[in-house]
């Protein structure tokens, strides 16, 4: 029996809306698997659900500070605790979100890379800050030629690859390929919502305009006031870099909107390709109605 439902898909595909519908109808609780919606201080820019809405209970949203060093491994532990609690309550767990790394780890399990010592992690970040992206990237490639596949601007992945090769002497890609992995849960059904791209692009554009019309500028001002390092995940949430540039008088608000919309659309485009090739046993749906119809007889709900 499948008694855990996972709903994923590109950004702005309607995951949250369909998850709410399913949870409302079936005594469910929604659990977050979006790597940016975990952060407490940025609910608007990350489009977090309204946690004051008592019609459906939400878990793992806005519960981590942007100043905290958090990882997919910590999220997995938090997730397992929440799912265990939900099942004990005889309620229906609906896991939803679109972060590729979180979904991949949930479905296939975590790579068993040794824990990185604090001294190695701190030295890696010191080097990154001292050398800058370009020279740090060159240093990484010299130590780990396989890491050349990483994008030069993906600070998080560059730092992670460097600290792994520095501590273990083995490329992070070798660890990931050779280490045995097991799914976190075995009793799940994975549904991927993939509406036409034109629909998603339209929603992305509209969503960012709606954010600008709320207090998102103030939210990012407060984020900046915390003085957290630029490589921290929250600083790279969609729209954050562009609004920061606006606040620093480097671009206009119209330019910030246009660039953020374009970057988010490009991200959604990459997500389409990634989801199509990543999960062999997933079920794909073009619309929310298709997904709803498909799962009607697939679960024993706890009503």
Curated annotation (Swiss-Prot):
Keyword tRNA processing: yes
Binding, substrate: 11-16
Disulphide-bonded residues: none
InterPro entries cross-referenced by the UniProt entry: Dimethylallyltransferase, IPT, P-loop_NTPase
Residue span of region Interaction with substrate tRNA: 34-37
Keywords for the protein's UniProt record, in alphabetical order: ATP-binding, Magnesium, Nucleotide-binding, Transferase, tRNA processing
Highest taxon of the lineage: Bacteria
Pfam families xref list: IPPT
EC number, UniProt record: 2.5.1.75
Gene3D superfamilies reported in the protein's UniProt record: 1.10.20.140, P-loop containing nucleotide triphosphate hydrolases
Binding site for ATP: 9-16
Cofactor: Mg(2+)
GO terms of molecular function: ATP binding; tRNA dimethylallyltransferase activity
The keyword Cell membrane is assigned to this record: no
GO biological process: tRNA modification
Catalytic activity: adenosine(37) in tRNA + dimethylallyl diphosphate = N(6)-dimethylallyladenosine(37) in tRNA + diphosphate
Site (Interaction with substrate tRNA): 99, 121
Subunit structure: Monomer.
Family: Belongs to the IPP transferase family.
Task performed by this protein: Catalyzes the transfer of a dimethylallyl group onto the adenine at position 37 in tRNAs that read codons beginning with uridine, leading to the formation of N6-(dimethylallyl)adenosine (i(6)A).
Protein name as annotated: tRNA dimethylallyltransferase
Source organism: Ehrlichia chaffeensis (strain ATCC CRL-10679 / Arkansas)
